[in-house]
Amino acid sequence: MIFKVWFSYEDEEVELSELTNDTTVSAIRKILHEGKIFRFPYGTSQTDLQIGKMLPSGSGGGATADSKFEKFKARNTLADIQYKVGDTLYVRVKKSKPTNDSLLPTLNIAFLDGSERAIKWEYDPYTTTAQWTCTATLVKVEPVPFAEGAFRKAYHTLDLSKSGASGRYVSKIGKKPTPRPSYFEDVKMQMIAKKWADKYNSFKPPKKIEFLQSCVLEFVDRTSSDLICGAEPYVEGQYRKYNNNSGFVSNDERNTPQSFSHFTYEHSNHQLLIIDIQGVGDHYTDPQIHTYDGVGFGIGNLGQKGFEKFLDTHKCNAICQYLNLQSINPKSEKSDCGTVPRPDLIFPDTSERDNNNNNNNNNNNNNNNNNNNSNNNNNNNSSISKSLVEISSGSKERNDRDSPSRQLFVSNDGNTLNTNKERSKSKSIDLEKPEILINNKKKESINLETIKLIETIKGYHVTSHLCICDNLLFTGCSDNSIRVYDYKSQNMECVQTLKGHEGPVESICYNDQYLFSGSSDHSIKVWDLKKLRCIFTLEGHDKPVHTVLLNDKYLFSGSSDKTIKVWDLKTLECKYTLESHARAVKTLCISGQYLFSGSNDKTIKVWDLKTFRCNYTLKGHTKWVTTICILGTNLYSGSYDKTIRVWNLKSLECSATLRGHDRWVEHMVICDKLLFTASDDNTIKIWDLETLRCNTTLEGHNATVQCLAVWEDKKCVISCSHDQSIRVWGWN
């Protein structure tokens, strides 16, 4: 039987519905406390609440001031107390025990300057009925953040109810308005992870781990913004991300967090997975929980998709073996220990999580930007893109005359090829390179025997994109900035840092006036190339922007929202939205009147820029297509299936498949009939496009090589990696 019950607290009365005879007093206390039904004193916990009835002192009926309160036991049900529909139950708050004032410390009033009242909500995962409790406290939050990520800012905070170092906290406040339940969900996840860490430690691994005791702070006296935040103890040291979209920051401590994720998967009977491990040393924070059914734990819970991504990328290490965990995705002995997760795990994408995060870092499309804007400076051949394909802001006549790619879809009779007709089945490889150099100056060939590492630039944040513009190198970083380097006297010097994005910068391109940057914050920023300042922001994508690309009329952008947007360079308005891909668009490339797009749906689509329609789809890769580039009548595509495919653009057939990398192919660039490929196996391979053989392998990075750029004037190739370094490889 379901019925309603009236409850009275002081001068307030409320009605709770859908209660039954089996409802316990403990359950009612939880409803009243968590639902904030009454305005209880600050600091009132669930166990402080008492439910009972009033026993009249005299012969008259009803409750009076002299009535006696009779408390029910927590385990009593409504049937036990013989509740009758229509009766009123009374709520009281247990009085605290009197204190001896002589034992209280002297209050330093000056210490309270700048302090504010707050309610601290804590979640206890260890009780059989895991529950929230709250206490009143006094805190002092610094007005200026000391650090920030893609979605939150971090503030030094003092909990004045604690003494010494134990009162030092970090408050994390969202940059944008965040629903109140999200903060509670994050704390709940971290405390559940803390419980799993204790179970992991009980198996006596080489290193014990700890998830910080987190809480939710609700500020009592604030009325405008930032009414709530997450908080956790402050830990001194360097903050690192071990297990997210930015890859590994360090090889020193990566085995432990990866084995912990594996441990949670196996010991939950494949029903739960704790991922996104990060923190200081072995003190972890901000995890994400995936569940098999995808229920609970916020939009970051990818369910079985999250499991699949982990299973596809995890490489068991010595600790996994020590803990007798079942082997996942066995690799060769040459494989490094640890896990290199898919780049798009950090991003907040409910359908694919193609980025954040953010935090989250996945910029596999970067080769396209090396092919941009080659016609801006006819006398300058400094960028590798300027020696490949005429795709940018030069005159239409020059594009028509010089660009060989305008003939890619032209039949022998001069008419546009109808891709629906029967195509040639020829598998021949056309490697003859047309004369498409910007000037007539003869290029010097690259002597592979002389290539060596000449400089290493180390930084705190991961660099995920490189773009060369004249004498400057622009780098997109995971700390939401663009760093500008000048190459002087064989040394790279950071001369400026551009800030404005609220998420990692994933792609950059430029023309003679502007620099364009795409970010996981879903926006594209337009920067004045001379003054290096942001002058406009393009908004339209619903999810992270992974790739941006230019021609003389339009800016093209690909996103996790599965679309390609076409922006008019004169008005900076979105003119077209191209929809055909089934998953995130990761890479773009232009040749003549055709746009090529690679996607996580494993395909490459060919778009006619006259009609803005998809003419054809190239299929062959078995996993995500991460990078594409064009030379002559061949298109080259790299994929997470570890291969590079060569497509003949006359027959639209795959003419060859290059194998050699042990892990994903992240990025490619072409220079002097050589194909440079960056991979998740930490190496750079150089392929001869005449023989289609790998001639050289460059080793030196300690983690995924994310992006490459060739600087021909400087006779070097530049690489950036998840190991937080930029390396310069030069030749004679």
Swiss-Prot record:
GO-annotated molecular function: ATP binding; identical protein binding; myosin heavy chain kinase activity; myosin II binding; protein serine/threonine kinase activity
All copies of domain Alpha-type protein kinase, residue ranges: 124-328
Keywords (A to Z) from UniProt: ATP-binding, Kinase, Nucleotide-binding, Repeat, Serine/threonine-protein kinase, Transferase, WD repeat
Compositional bias annotation for Basic and acidic residues: 395-404
UniProt biased composition (Low complexity): 356-394
GO biological process terms on file: mitotic cytokinesis; myosin II filament disassembly; response to differentiation-inducing factor 1
EC number: 2.7.11.7
Catalytic activity: L-threonyl-[myosin heavy-chain] + ATP = O-phospho-L-threonyl-[myosin heavy-chain] + ADP + H(+)
Region Disordered: start-end pairs: 331-428
This protein's GO CC annotations: actomyosin contractile ring; cytoplasm
Binding residues annotated for ATP, in chain numbering: 298-303
InterPro entries noted in UniProt: a-kinase_dom, Alpha-type_PK, G-protein_beta_WD-40_rep, Kinase-like_dom_sf, WD40/YVTN_repeat-like_dom_sf, WD40_repeat_CS, WD40_repeat_dom_sf, WD40_rpt
WD repeats: 458-486, 500-528, 540-568, 580-608, 620-648, 660-688, 700-730
Enzyme class: transferase
Disulfide bonds, paired cysteine numbers: none
PANTHER family, sorted: EUKARYOTIC ELONGATION FACTOR 2 KINASE-RELATED, MYOSIN HEAVY CHAIN KINASE B
Family: Belongs to the protein kinase superfamily. Alpha-type protein kinase family. ALPK subfamily.
Protein name: Myosin heavy chain kinase B
Provenance organism: Dictyostelium discoideum
